[in-house]
Amino acid sequence: GWTEWTQGFQFGSAILQFDATDDEQFLEIGRRNTIERMAPHVSHIGVHDHGFNNVSTYGNLRRLMLEDRISMDERERDFYDLALKVSGAVQASRWSTTADGSGYVYSFNGPHSLFCDTIRSMRSLSMAHQLGHSLMDENDGSVSLLDRMIQHARSTAKYNVYYGEGRDSYDVRGRVAHESIFNCNDGRYRCPSTQQGFSPFSTWTRGLAWIIAGYPEQLEFLQTVSDEILDSLGGRDEVEDMMLNAARA
């Protein structure tokens, strides 16, 4: 069922429990279940949850190995790397374009739906990019995962986050709409919506937390990306200002 997206938390939390306590039983729980039960999440084309699921499991195991918290095994690390590369590309393939020439990774509701949650799955695109991967598309076209991450971050900041600048009568600085709805035929923005919040015109607090956590994650990641690469994507100043404004709103 759709609630299986929480398996990333379930097994990832065991890995973090080991990280905090050095209790080997939690490492065993997290590692075994990641290997035995997380593969469907890596290739899942129907959700926006790759960051929650795969970075929380494969990503944390890889991190612990690189930090010498667990023994280094090159083949095991290759396994984690492959999972993270595939996850980022699969997540990036779930793409809708917008009328302003940008786009977003759409939610499990369908191509019309941009969730604020998904900013925290941009981790999967960023990690896959950092590992040298891209999304291969029709006619062997190579799609930059970094580009898609930044486009998604821009769209979320533009449509889901409110800045108190008079956008509409509900534009209160710091308000976050859980969901933005688009016309799939022409990519035009239609209205705010909500999957789990009280209403489209209130703030879903958990969604606000995703914004507050998700943008700083990407700001930290951007410190590993060269100015030269970012120049073709709007420039470091513009990209970082956009993310910082969204996180602070």
Identify the function of each model-found stretch.
Residues 1-249:
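Glycan-recognition and catalytic cores of secretory/periplasmic carbohydrate-active enzymes
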